[in-house]
Curated annotation (Swiss-Prot):
InterPro entries noted in UniProt: Rbsml_bL25/Gln-tRNA_synth_N (IPR020056), Ribosomal_bL25/Gln-tRNA_synth (IPR011035), Ribosomal_bL25_b-dom (IPR020057), Ribosomal_bL25_C (IPR037121), Ribosomal_bL25_long (IPR001021), Ribosomal_bL25_short (IPR020055), Ribosomal_L25_dom (IPR029751), Ribosomal_uL5_bac-type (IPR020930)
GO cellular component, one term: cytosolic large ribosomal subunit
Region annotation (Disordered) ranges: 184-205
Function: This is one of the proteins that binds to the 5S RNA in the ribosome where it forms part of the central protuberance.
Pfam families, alphabetized: Ribosomal_L25p (PF01386), Ribosomal_TL5_C (PF14693)
Sorted UniProt keywords: Ribonucleoprotein, Ribosomal protein, RNA-binding, rRNA-binding
Residue stretches in coiled coil: none
One annotated GO molecular function: 5S rRNA binding
Record-given protein name: Large ribosomal subunit protein bL25
Alphabetical list of PANTHER family matching this protein: RIBOSOMAL PROTEIN L25/GLN-TRNA SYNTHETASE, ANTI-CODON-BINDING DOMAIN-CONTAINING PROTEIN, RIBOSOMAL PROTEIN L25_GLN-TRNA SYNTHETASE, ANTI-CODON-BINDING DOMAIN-CONTAINING PROTEIN
Biased composition, class Low complexity, residue ranges: 186-205
Gene Ontology terms: biological process: translation
Length: 205
């Protein structure tokens, strides 16, 4: 995905405010051997790009003053109540250095999973993304979680997911965390419990 930016020479709160009033968003690109560079981007283009999943989890081609660099979106700051992007940070990436990125999960075959189709259960997304380590060329836009064989009251763990080549998951404390599950709706569980209690009641003499 290509992102066009321009060099920004003036800094400070007042300069940033004037920049935003002109329809631009201040930002910075840092990392690698080069010095950090102050940049500005068209706000509307950035606003629409931020709505795309790939913008957050893929290598971007950031063009500044006609020169392209590979970069990752690292952070962005929003206005508390206005639809306004206040600032954006990009990090340069090197083809030979591994990166740490959160990659979104795409849950496949949810409606046709046995636990949903036959067991009338609901799918619970315990995790929505995974933090991975890989070379930039191996970074996937998303990771698939296939629920095609998941039964009612079963849980899918990290070890059940087939990771793309060259990608490892960074876990924090739990080496095999739960990713998704299929369970009975809360109402169905309550009704079943009430039915069991009613069946166990003994009529008064």
């Amino acid at each position: 995905m290509k992102v066009v930016a321009f060099e920004r020479s003036v800094q400070g709160t007042g300069a940033s405010r004037r920049l935003r009033n002109s329809g631009k968003t201040p930002g910075i690109i840092y990392g690698g051997a080069a010095e950090p560079k102050m940049i500005e981007l068209d706000h509307n283009a950035l606003w629409h790009a931020l709505k795309k999943e790939a913008f957050h989890s893929s290598i971007l081609e950031l063009e500044v003053a006609g020169k392209s660099e590979q970069a990752l979106l690292r952070a962005f700051q929003m206005h508390p109540f206005k639809p306004l992007v206040l600032h954006v940070d990009f990090q340069r990436v090197s083809a030979n250095d591994k990166i740490h990125v959160k990659v979104p999960l795409h849950f496949m075959n949810q409606e046709t999973a046995p636990g949903v189709k036959l067991g009338h259960g609901i799918v619970n997304h315990i995790l929505n993304d995974l933090e991975v380590s890989c070379l930039p060329a191996d970074l996937p836009e998303f990771i698939e979680v296939d629920l095609a064989a998941v039964e009612l009251n079963q849980t899918v763990h990290l070890s059940d997911i087939k990771l793309p080549k060259g990608v490892t998951v960074i876990t924090h404390g739990d080496d095999n965390p739960a990713v998704a599950s299929i369970s009975q709706p809360a109402g169905a569980v309550s009704e079943a419990a009430e039915g069991g209690e009613a069946a166990g009641e003994t009529p008064a003499a």
